[in-house]
Amino acid sequence: MAAINRDDVAHLARLAHIEMSAEELDRMAGELAVIVESVKSVSEAAGDDVPATSHPIPLTNVFREDVVGHTFTAEQSLSGAPDAYEGRFKVPAILDED
């Protein structure tokens, strides 16, 4: 990876329509150079014998089997509701109708 310099940061800032002072350009160039070096060192550490992974640990399904148990009918569910309309719970509106 090529080193990031002040001119690169200025070019990127222009592309992103971000105004940066000379001090900000210098500081950002230094910070980005550190990041690039960090990525470079990680790239070197992972050799061809290390398989690419998206997770550091294997993923397994930890969900239980979906077993249908005792369920209430719609009427039973709505029996304790303070208000219902056409077989559904009726609740106060919280959003405008705009």
Curated annotation (Swiss-Prot):
- Give the domain of life: Bacteria
For this protein, the Enzyme Commission number is 6.3.5.-
Which principal EC class is assigned to this enzyme?
ligase
What does the entry give for GO biological process?
Answer: regulation of translational fidelity; translation
Q: Does the keyword Chaperone apply?
A: no
Asked if Ligase is a keyword of the record, the answer is yes
- What is an example of a GO molecular function annotated in this UniProt entry? ATP binding
Keywords, comma-separated and alphabetical? ATP-binding, Ligase, Nucleotide-binding, Protein biosynthesis
Q: What does the record give as the reaction this protein catalyses?
A: L-glutamyl-tRNA(Gln) + L-glutamine + ATP + H2O = L-glutaminyl-tRNA(Gln) + L-glutamate + ADP + phosphate + H(+); L-aspartyl-tRNA(Asn) + L-glutamine + ATP + H2O = L-asparaginyl-tRNA(Asn) + L-glutamate + ADP + phosphate + 2 H(+)
Describe its assembly.
Heterotrimer of A, B and C subunits.
- Give the protein's biological function: Allows the formation of correctly charged Asn-tRNA(Asn) or Gln-tRNA(Gln) through the transamidation of misacylated Asp-tRNA(Asn) or Glu-tRNA(Gln) in organisms which lack either or both of asparaginyl-tRNA or glutaminyl-tRNA synthetases. The reaction takes place in the presence of glutamine and ATP through an activated phospho-Asp-tRNA(Asn) or phospho-Glu-tRNA(Gln).
Stated family:
Belongs to the GatC family.
Task: Specify the protein name.
Answer: Aspartyl/glutamyl-tRNA(Asn/Gln) amidotransferase subunit C
Lineage, highest ranks first: Bacteria, Bacillati, Actinomycetota, Actinomycetes, Micrococcales
Name of the coding gene: gatC
